């Protein structure tokens, strides 16, 4: 995936986000049907997206690895997220989510890249970037989709919702091909 590809933010979130289990099954089965692979880069979800994928029978045919890049330094070192992007936009931004997708796709040479960054709380939120703000990106072929979400609940609820949203966005990206 070239870094010069189109990146945009979807204007409307999904009306309904299915469960992580259901979305993972849909994603793994579609990837298997079209003989493609997925890689992940996760921050606030801490591996939950990868765990949901590998919980599906047959995942080994479509999933090679994932990155957990919780701190900025890991995002930069492992995924190539620009220090300037991190400084200007912060780790919780559409720009960083897009660069995470580019970076993990390049590192793992997968067809589909899913990335998640956000604030799961309970601390760390601001008026501009409240707890529950999550950016999910999906890189497929020549484009990266970035979706902004505002989830509610405790830390685990926010992480679970972000996981389900990432898997659903990945599935949506494949269906839109």
Predicted regions and their residues:
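Short alpha-helical segments enriched in small residues
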Residues: 2-177
């Amino acid at each position: 995936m070239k870094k010069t590809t189109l990146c945009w933010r979807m204007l409307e979130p999904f009306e309904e986000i299915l469960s992580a289990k259901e979305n993972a099954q849909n994603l793994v089965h579609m990837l298997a049907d079209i003989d493609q692979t997925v890689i992940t880069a996760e921050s606030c979800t801490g591996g939950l997206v990868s765990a949901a994928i590998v919980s599906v029978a047959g995942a080994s045919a479509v999933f090679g690895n994932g990155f957990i890049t919780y701190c900025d330094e890991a995002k930069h070192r492992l995924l190539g997220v620009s220090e300037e992007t991190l400084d200007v936009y912060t780790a919780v931004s559409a720009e960083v989510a897009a660069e995470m997708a580019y970076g993990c796709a390049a590192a793992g040479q997968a067809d589909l890249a899913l990335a998640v960054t956000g604030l799961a709380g309970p601390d760390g939120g601001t008026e501009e970037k409240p707890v529950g703000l999550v950016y999910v990106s999906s890189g497929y072929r020549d484009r990266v989709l970035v979706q902004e979400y505002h989830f509610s609940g405790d830390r685990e609820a926010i992480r679970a919702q972000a996981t389900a949203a990432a898997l659903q966005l990945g599935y949506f990206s494949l269906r839109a091909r």
